[in-house]
Amino acid sequence: MLPATSHANGSHPAWDNPMGTDGFEFIEYAAPDPVAMGALFERMGFKAIAKHRHKAVTLYRQGGINFILNAEPDSFAQRFARLHGPSICAIAFRVQDAKAAYERALSLGAWGYAGQAGPGELNIPAI
């Protein structure tokens, strides 16, 4: 006999993965003092491995974990950090089907976001 909360196929609703998530691609941070935040990342074992060509944005990596530090002065991330302190300003999830996950999120009430991609940048749909 299956518990009342299980599906007939044996799966459990709490374990379903309708968005097809498969981990995190990156977590993006901003801080009023980006130099101090970068130093904290390095003390935690992260290495600065790449910098954006035209913006004050740095990629830190430790193993398979990616942190992005956004120090771009006129960005939403920096304006938010100046008001609220060190903050996570974006999270990128790995998904099996990006289009399907995006459409499902919108169908569930998420709002789409389209940033302003600069030269040589990708315009990636976001929510």
What is the role of each PLM region?
Residues 1-17, 21-32, 61-71, 78-127:
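Vicinal oxygen chelate
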Residues 23-28, 41, 46, 60, ...:
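Short, structured motif recognition centered on aromatic/hydrophobic residues
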Residues 32-37, 46-49:
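Transmitter module of two-component histidine kinases
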Residues 37-42, 105:
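Conserved active-site tyrosine of GNAT-family acetyltransferases
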Residues 43-54, 112-118:
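Short secondary-structure junctions
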Residues 49, 74-80:
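Membrane-interface interhelical loops and short amphipathic "cap" helices
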